[in-house]
Amino acid sequence: MRRRRRNRSPFPCGQPWTHVNSGITIPAALDELPRVRATSFAAPELDISQNFASEDGRESLTIQIFRNTNGSVPVWFAQAERAILLRADLKNPVLAVPVTAFTPPGQSAASGLKAVFAPEEVEGIRSTGVALFVVGDWYVKLRANSASLIPSDMSGWMEGVIAELTLPAGSAPAAAPIADCAARLDFPDTSADSTLPAAMLTAGVKDAAARIESPRWCLDRVVRGNQAVYRPDGASDRYLFAAGDSGKAFAVQPHGAAATRYHSINFLTADRTFTLPAQAALPPPQRLLDLAAAKRSVAASKTWPTP
């Protein structure tokens, strides 16, 4: 699978910038912090970030917009939280303001999530926060650091910063912090490719499978680092294996019935879907990693531009 490459993205100095795909406009400065860098991770503007900072570096903000190809706000917020906890320089920060839902500008439901952490004995960072919400087909993530704000003030500051964005009209479902699944998935002792004839391996193999949809997701397990398994609450035959905190994930789901049943594996990125060999039964997460490491992709389909 492709590595995430960073490219400096041109932006109008001192001018607002509009994300062409979503219509979101980001000002040249957020709460008087000037834009200092813009980065593109996947063209054309499928995964971008912009950084804002005070001259002395005591306050900083990062806005990231990445394509919504899978999961939900609770899923990708949980990944963003874990990314903070895994940062060695933050020294296992304490959750100071628990995960709270908020209503993004122009939306009617509390469809966004935010949280604030308080690093201990970390020079230059008194509080660090994250907020995430969805605008149509795009996730919007805010990261904020401050050397002066206490956690409760950081929480309010983030909402104030988000209010400075110009967002297109739209709606999104209410969000709630993700919870652990009631029971963990039970995987077979061995994993193997499906032995069905190639003609029967269509959905999710020859072509990308349909998106796994669910009004409510739960956390099945953290595999390691910021790799975690989520699934529709109550489902036992499918899951999403999130890799990192920017939208990349493996989607595993069943197809067919009885003797013709198999499980597809799709690796979802910002602009395409890679299909891996069909599996005879529900594969454990390590099987996905092994197949990806062995570069056993059988097909790739572009998902951008959308049909």
Please report, for each region that a protein language model flagged, where it lies by residue.
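Short, well-ordered beta-strand elements
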Residues: 61-64, 137-147
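Short, surface-exposed coil-to-beta transition loops
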Residues: 45-49, 60, 123-129
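A short acidic-to-branched-hydrophobic micro-motif
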Residues: 48-80, 200-203, 210-211, 220-256, ...
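Mid-length scaffold segments of soluble, non-membrane domains
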Residues: 71-101
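Signature of long, low-cysteine stretches enriched in small and polar/charged residues
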Residues: 91-132
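Short, hydrophobic/aromatic-rich segments at coil-to-beta transitions
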Residues: 32-36, 45-50, 107-118
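Extended, charged low-complexity segments
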Residues: 231-307
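Surface-exposed amphipathic alpha-helical segments
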Residues: 142-193, 288-301
